[in-house]
Amino acid sequence: MATATYPPPPPYYRLYKDYSENPNSAPEPPPPIEGTYVCFGGNYTTEDVLPSLEEQGVPQLYPKDSNLDYKNELRSLNRELQLHILELADVLVDRPSQYAKRIGEISSIFKNLHHLLNSLRPHQARATLIHIMELQIQQRKQAVEDIKRRREEAQRLLKDAYLTLDGQ
């Protein structure tokens, strides 16, 4: 009884056998998934929406203002977090049975901090793309200048060679 070293290829490889001669012979890829889908037992959505803190069942500790100063709110939440951690240390020393309330407050502060940071991600991504594109423009301008400089140098060398050959 003979056994194969490798398993046989999947049957759909036949769909691509003429690809080298005619790239259009391959089947079109499936359309992108829209809406919700299940992956490894979890439900996911293709809409990239940040759920509000209320939807997550977490009290919002910063104002619900559209003109929110993220920097100041992050600083104040950070200070509040430090204060609550110190209070937790005091509670653990004096009243160890009441630590659960402090842990819940610290958890709420962390969730608010993370929500604020996650709401800044689109702005950060946009700024990163702008920076990358500016770098690409700068690199391309430098490449064009380098090409011009090398072209002028090549023209000068050709002119010198022509004059040298013409003078002999």
Swiss-Prot record:
Its main location: nucleus. GO terms for biological process: de-etiolation; regulation of transcription by RNA polymerase II; regulation of unidimensional cell growth. Keywords: Coiled coil, Nucleus, Transcription, Transcription regulation. It is found in: Nucleus. Pfam families: Med7 (PF05983). GO terms for cellular component: mediator complex. Residues 64-92, 132-166 form a coiled coil. One of its GO terms (molecular function) is transcription coregulator activity. Belongs to the Mediator complex subunit 7 family. Component of the Mediator complex, a coactivator involved in the regulated transcription of nearly all RNA polymerase II-dependent genes. Mediator functions as a bridge to convey information from gene-specific regulatory proteins to the basal RNA polymerase II transcription machinery. The Mediator complex, having a compact conformation in its free form, is recruited to promoters by direct interactions with regulatory proteins and serves for the assembly of a functional pre-initiation complex with RNA polymerase II and the general transcription factors. Component of the Mediator complex. Interacts with MEE14/CBP1. This is Mediator of RNA polymerase II transcription subunit 7a. It comes from Arabidopsis thaliana (Mouse-ear cress). The lineage of its organism: Eukaryota, Viridiplantae, Streptophyta, Embryophyta, Tracheophyta.
